[in-house]
């Protein structure tokens, strides 16, 4: 049929072009142009996001919006001053527009449930879709044929609908509004449209069922998938053809993808597609709605993103669209849903369009996803893209958008391709379509998905081959989709993400993937089936399934898809995959699915998916994540399955095939991959590798890949670029896959991570992560995975990052060696053993890939990558290592892990980077940048998402992260985002499920890991190992580790940060926990165990210890920073991003306060962080003051009284807090004025002195401006302290102690003299009932030799001193030993090469 429809599509395309031209005749008016994609050639635009970019035609509002109707506005966020609202809360305030019930009520409420419900139906829908598929294409065609314009209009409507639906509509609001507007305007068609819309809506509903075809696809995520599938199916030929064409287009597509959403508008074909899509979407929407709901939450963010993205997309679309649109349109129809996304995308692409179409769908999905994810992804993507750079931009779509166009092209192709990959994923369906051509196309779609774009981007290149990926991805997506369906559960979650995402993406993906693939191939049925399956599984698994399916599917599918037959395979695979996944899913089911899927998906997707997956995954994950499933799933499945399922899924499919080869690889990958992927490129590599492999695999392997794909897919997806590597990639693939799997596995861990992830993810920051990865990885693996993501993110950027990561990884690499071990470990997890071997190999492969990846990542990465690569492998290894380590980490690290993630990522990355960096740095830098971007983006996105989603997302994020991780990897962002998301959920869920399953497996695995590596156990040791490993890396490693550790935290933080932060704070504990969690992630049990550990560690204090060890272990250098972060886990994290430096206590900046707690712990405070210092290990990871101490930061100063109680006082502005060790006393804060006899002014440092003979206990307040005031405590009877504080040998005692001691003794005489002075104080003893505040005097008057600028001061317990203390004051980079009795201060000169931070903080 596809072939038959091809001509039609072509005709449609022609007509579309014509129409487009026609419609473009009057470019200064929106008449007939409402919702059309963005075009740089137009003087003004009418896409639904034009307002965001202030590029709307003057009559846009009049022509394209309806003030009193909810048509297309269901997902827009609330805005003041409107006559009526259509957001989910309007009912609460009784301000809903009159037609709210008919347009949005269902979406907002039932949706959720429906979602679930629907989700399942989607299965049915899928079937329907199947029909639909056929039908869809037709209608679209018909429609399209009818009139592009009309179509367009319709599309618009649909678009609107869809948009609205999509709302993911991210555009949602924008779109919605726009849509609404457009609708209204729509040409006056508004009415018609309205009717139509209503009709559509009904149709949608009905259609969904009925049209289901289109809708169904949409409908369920599966629908979406279907949709994708559908059109995909239809599209297939066209698509394929187009795809092929598109392929090229892809480039464009990519851009388009962005458009995707907008694409919708593009309409024409989009329209048709849209219709379908819409329907689909609608359904989806419903489902999606749930999603939406979810999405809605997301919405905001999504919206934003969406909007942005949409706009971008739209814009892109528009411009792209136009042509593309047309083209697309035709194909689109097929894709219809896809179109939508794709359309846009396609449009751009034109040919791609078709493919795009899928994209469309995807887009759509993506959009939502994007949106949702988008936010995550998009944003992320951007970053990711960034990574991809081109893509990213594009991805950013929003950013890209604009960029896209250009970018797109440029990128597009790649992007598309790449994207495709992702898209593919999404596209997958497309892929099917794609199948072969599709692939390209697919990519395109992918692009749309793009969101995935980012990934896609990567993939895109891959794209062609990607297709497989795509498929794969889609699969993931699909799963996702299904997930969505399943999501159902997730739905909400999923929905949100998934749904939208999923649906959109997933659906598309799934469907698409499967569908497309299948359908296309098996054609619809299959598709349907596939989708269904996917979906189905999804439903079943629902989350799980979907996810799983997704993954597996994706993998499989993907794989298949590419293959086409594959497709069927996909289907089957898919199915199986799903099944497996499902299985996993079942296990986790939810979890699993996600997990599996996610993981895998992510994995698969991840890479590709990443984008998509990411999206999807993210979405799903996200969703899922929330679901955790993913996480869980991953965790669980992953773990268990994870290995099996997840792995399974991915692995399975992947593994299976891949497995064999890959498998090991995967395994390895997993181990390695994770490691590698994770680590190395982890992200990049991963990605790249994966990608490459993937690609290659897919492409070549594709088939094989399929298997691999799955793994590969992920990989593939992931890497398209890898494509190049492709070959290697395959190998890589495995890794990738593995990775993925690994990831997955890792993921699992990742999940853990995710959970942790969140942290980790944040960690993600992957870059760091990578670095961390190793360490983290282990733990991290999950983390790593996550990490990966981070890396991923970086990955993309990362690639570069990757490299860095890799670098990191390299460090890891160093580890690498270990890695193998680790891998083993990791592998253990998966193949564990083999993995190791393989992994190792893979790793290499990866590296290899990485290079490709790098390529992909392109060169930047590449260059780096190479290193990375090497590293990568190493990294991989490291990763593994890391993983193990992580494990350990996890254990210990757990926190660290988290931290690690976190920090590393952000901070570390940089930092790490730094260390590693340098190499990495470059990379990193890039990465960072990228990362940053990504992270940033991510963060942003994440944040957004996070925010919105946050809770959900968080979970998701995590998941995503995981996914992301995987995915992210591709996108860092996503990851982040994901992470963020996931974490939350993940954590929870994950923990749970994971725990269970994960635990088990993981545990097992882990244990295995552990055992294997010991790592887990060892982890810690591992750490060391790692360290060594790292060390191997050399310092870097160290850093890495350190990073890792921090990374965990940091990153997450970072990304998470946002989220975490959010969460973190709350989470902090959680974070810690989470961190722990992350570890958790890894093994839940472990987690638990870890957790505990972590927790302990996590616990601030406990954490410290734990941390300390761990951090110290490798933290030295970075540690500070990282440690810092880790310490803070969440907190630190945040900073992390930029902070790298802020969280690095060893950067030479003076601290705000340094004190010893009553229990002898030496604590340094600077900015928003604090570090626990130990004489024998590097500083702990930075932790947030606010999260642990509960006081606002930064503080002005801190001091601990030199008496038996040893209370610690914090000063901030005009208030002070009193703590007993780290427990805040009741009744604080209190005004400084009242507590210290009228003390006022800006306090910069405080030195507490002990009571000795006639000297009263007092405290000297150094104030801004060089003055000092002494406050003498009310005198109390002399008492012997029952158990004196523990005598600790502080680092500073090393060198100057003796001299000081002699000095002190010599000074005793004067002391007495002083005593007399002080006698004054004694005189004051009269005021025994209260303390006395002396007048302000210049510092130099009170103490000779002390500079006017004192930044901090400390009383160190020293049992060898007469009064039991040594007193020090710090001024910039110099410190002084203060002799209280003689009132003199002597500057301490450190031995050559020693710095103040080395002496005091034991910095490396």
UniProtKB/Swiss-Prot annotation:
Annotated region (Disordered), positions in chain: 111-966, 992-1104
Stretches with biased composition (Pro residues): 432-467, 476-506, 562-592, 602-611, 653-667, 677-699, 762-776, 831-853
One GO cellular component term: collagen-containing extracellular matrix
UniProt keyword annotation of Secreted present: yes
PTM note: N-glycosylated.
Residues in SMB domain copies: 26-69, 66-108
Function noted in UniProt: Plays a role in boundary lubrication within articulating joints. Prevents protein deposition onto cartilage from synovial fluid by controlling adhesion-dependent synovial growth and inhibiting the adhesion of synovial cells to the cartilage surface.
Protein's name according to its UniProt entry: Proteoglycan 4
Source organism: Homo sapiens
Gene from which this protein is expressed: PRG4
